[in-house]
Amino acid sequence: MSFGKKEYWEDWVLEEEDEVFKIMKAAYDAGIRTFDTANIYSAGVSEELVGKFIRKYEIPRSSIVIMSKCFSPVRKDLIKLYMDLSSRGVQLHDSPELANQCGLSRKHIFDAVQDSVKRLGTYIDVLQIHRYDPHVSAEEVMRALNDVVESGKVRYIGASTMRYYQFIELQNTAEKHGWHKFISMQNYHNLLYREEEREMIPYCQKTGVGLIPWSPLARGLLTRSIDANEETIRSKTDLYTRALEFGAGYKAILSRVEELAKKYNVSMATLATAWSLHKGDYPIVGISKVERLQDALASVTLKLNEEDIKYLEEPYCPVPIQGEI
């Protein structure tokens, strides 16, 4: 999501190809082998950059994992409309402009996969459904996903951003028919939002579904002090950041992240990501600078003890369900 084109996405997107490839190459050289993107990110430009990176550096295809997503529209003229309607809770199927341009119908899944493979220039290792679609039957969704795997264009399927009961419905449908099931769940989970720990995460852990949460740093809020006056382009313009709600323990959590980061002489970002890794997650991190990559890599070697974990989690208070925009 961090790479693409400002015109098609957000002002904080990195669009200079040399800088993008510099970060991706640094990640690859450091041992990072999984790259997560989506067809909607910058109207497909993000996927194109992943494909260009592989070809530019002649990366052996078998050495990396490419994850992409389908659900949303990709046409440049429809993305802003889609984002606006989604943020206001408007039913997407009520918009004639979005007919057959988004959702999880068999037609749209097939079209989305075909276009993503073309932009990437290769197959997709893990195709994730970006959202749950209440207007398409579980049978249609899971059969279509099974068929794109059987076609060879996709190797595995994953899910993202949905309620526990919705995920269960889809998994059970696939199991009933002997179709391919989801191997991963990309949900919203971090120190400021832990509602997924009630049902989704225990289920995934019990059934062997990999957890790869998005926004482990809560849209960057876990990277700076509560008293910091720093305002980034993203914090001022990001639709999702403005939609977040926090519990009564929000300030205490940030304060404790800052305190422990100083104790271990690491950044707050490193500390917060280390917590995510400790919970058994494999978080998706967005990187726009090489220095931020170093913060993420440092989290792998930072081992928090149980006292640290308890101290960080203690102030948490329940909050409304989020992350489904």
Curated annotation (Swiss-Prot):
One of the Pfam families matching this protein, by short name: Aldo_ket_red
Record-linked SUPFAM superfamilies: NAD(P)-linked oxidoreductase
Domain of life: Eukaryota
Keywords linked to the UniProt accession: Oxidoreductase
Enzyme class: oxidoreductase
EC number: 1.1.1.-
Family: Belongs to the aldo/keto reductase family. Aldo/keto reductase 2 subfamily.
PANTHER family given in the database record: ARYL-ALCOHOL DEHYDROGENASE AAD16-RELATED, NADH-SPECIFIC METHYLGLYOXAL REDUCTASE-RELATED
Protein name per the record: Putative aryl-alcohol dehydrogenase C750.01
Protein source organism: Schizosaccharomyces pombe (strain 972 / ATCC 24843)
